[in-house]
Every structure is written in C-alpha cells, then in structure tokens.
Amino acid sequence: MASIHPPVCDFGWPAPDFNLVNVDGRSLSRDQLMGEKGLLVMFICNHCPYVKAILPRLVADCRELNSLGINSVAIMSNDPTVYPEDGFEHMQKIATELHFPFAYLVDPSQQVAKSYGAVCTPDFFGFNSQGQLQYRGRFDESRKETASHSSRDLFHAMRGIAETGVGPAEQIASIGCSMKWLED
C-alpha cells in the first residue's frame, strides 16, 4: 500500500459540481451540500489505515465545523473490486456505526475524483462560501496510527475559512493510500 501526497492548494480554484448517491439512497449535489460559510469535500474510503486513524476525530471535527456554517461531504471513489471493504454496503455500515454528520457519497465512475484531482484517501478540499478552494492539506500529523497529539490542521483551516473566507498560506499536504482506479 503506497503512501501518496496530493499537490498543494490552488487558491481560488472552483469546486467542480457533482451529483452522487448518498448511503441513504438520495442523490445529492455540490450546491445542495454547500454550507453558509463553505464546504469541506473529503475523499475517504473504508479500508485505508490513514483514514481509519483519523475517522472518529474527523467525525467530531465535522460536527463542530457544521456549527460554524461549514458543511462536509465524504466521497468514496475507490474501485470496490480491489478492496471489497470499500463497497456500498460497507459504506452504509460505517456511516451508521460512526453516526456520520455528513453525507457519504459513492462515485462509481470515479469522474468526481478525477474532476477534483483527488489522488489519495484521505484527500481534503476546503472551499469558502463562493466555492473557491482555500485548503488542500492534511487532517493533522497522524499517519497510519493516530498521532499522540493533534494539531487539528484541517479544523483550524476550515474555522478560518468560516470566519474570513480565506485559508491559511502555509499548508502541509495530506498523506494517504493511493486511489484504487478502475481498469481501463
């Protein structure tokens, strides 16, 4: 399982639209999910140890961000034939068990992941209320294990975006498992 780093933030880049199916069966779009102060788009999956290491804290931070006007959405774009744990029924199970405060969408064609330029799980895209990219960085210093101390990089960046509409100038790239792309 290779560790992948995404590129740095391209400030002002517009959030691509999408319309994907949530674990509850509803189709949801970017515009439906946009919060009053912004939107956090998170590419995650169920099998990746980098995601597993942060998931309970990510859920808690997304709850807190929601109270600040930042909505969150998780998108699973991996090919589930590579890792069956990433299949839709497992997505439903984990979303229920952890009481996700955000939609968990499936991207079976992987077109949304490609339009965002997602390269790993987790991969975070923080947009302000105008849909302009302001953060593309890490959750915190956790890797495959939970860090003993959390700097809460993602939370602090998104809180700043809620307050000012602008992300931090200094951002540390996320690290995670490579996307599991469909065979051509």
How does the language model describe each region?
Residues M1-Q171, S178-L182:
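Chalcogenol-based redox active-site neighborhoods
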